Structure formats: C-alpha cells, structure tokens
Curated annotation (Swiss-Prot):
Residues 184-206 are annotated as: 3 X 8 AA repeats of S-P-R-R-R-R-S-Q. The record marks 183-184 as: Cleavage. This is External core antigen. Residues 165-212 are annotated as: Disordered. Residues 1-19 form the signal peptide. Residues 25-27 are annotated as: HBEAG. The lineage of its organism: Viruses, Riboviria, Pararnavirae, Artverviricota, Revtraviricetes. It holds the Pfam family Hep_core_N. It comes from Hepatitis B virus genotype D subtype ayw (isolate Italy/CI/1992).
Amino acid sequence: MQLFHLCLIISCTCPTVQASKLCLGWLWGMDIDPYKEFGATVELLSFLPSDFFPSVRDLLDTASALYREALESPEHCSPHHTALRQAILCWGELMTLATWVGVNLEDPASRDLVVSYVNTNMGLKFRQLLWFHISCLTFGRETVIEYLVAFGVWIRTPPAYRPPNAPILSTLPETTVVRRRGRSPRRRTPSPRRRRSQSPRRRRSQSRESQC
C-alpha cells in the first residue's frame, strides 16, 4: 500500500504547497493538517459523518458549475481556488492510476482491495476537502467554521440536552443574505405600492361621489 501512495505522489501534479501537504501527509504520516491555514482542522471536519459529504462526482459538478471560470483562470483568485485546482488535478490522476491498477492487476482480490481503499479512505478525504473549499467559496469561510463548531457541539451533546435536528449550513447564510438584500427594497417598495393602490381607490370613490 505504501507503493500505491508513492505512485500517487509521482503521478500527482503538485506545484503548490497545498497539494504537497495533501499528498505527503498521507504518505509519511506527517503531522500536516491541510485545514489549519484556513482556520479549521481535520478533527473539526471529522465530526461530520461520512455520509454527510456528497460524492466526489457531485462535488466536482458543483465546482464546475459555480467556479469553472475562476478555476480555469491563470490568475490567482484565492487560496480556496488554488486548493480546489490541485485537489481536482490529484483526483483525476488518482482515478487514472486506479484504472491502470484495475486493468493490470490480475488478482481480483487485490484489485478489489485497492478499489475499496481508494473509495473508503482517500475518497472520503477528497470529499471532505472539496466540500470544505466549495462551501467556503459559497457561504464564506467564517460561516463554514461557525457551522463546523456548531455541529461539533451539537453532536457531542447528549441527545436529551440538544435540539432534535442538527444545524444546517445552508440556513445560516440565507438568513443573512435575505436580510441584507431585503432591507433596502422593503423600505423603498411600500410607498410606491401604497400610492399605486390608493390612487385607484380614490379615483373610484371620487367617480362614485360624482355619479351620486
């Protein structure tokens, strides 16, 4: 299995420190946390169950739909974009290597073991990594960190003393965005609506009075 990791390092395009952290930490067991520079930790993300994270395919589709132009840009957009670029490249190389192993490894048991290892261990780490950076770009890093802390507190609290439902990340920024975007229109829209709605009534009442 160490040879498998070594093949991953060789085949992975890792020109940045972020991607090097991701690969080297898995190979030699170095105490490197790819989330620390963003204010989170591997332990903090580990509170989220494995089935919480979407599949790699869904996460890649999301990243492509939302940030494809920025990811393909030669310019530096943000550390999250850089981390996403390298994670996507490494995942593509990993899939190429896994396909090669599946084709050339004659022993079915060994082949299934490799596939299972990739999907269970490395697949989960990539899902966590992709989810974290996509969420930070979508909702903001502070909101994501706040959510991770809130979920960690919730999951460690005994069921009798915690709310029945876990915190939901999507509800945090939506309330903020709605308030910020809704204040100015709500202050501006009532007066025209009242004027528009009152003017026909006045006209109708005046016409009725004239008719009487």
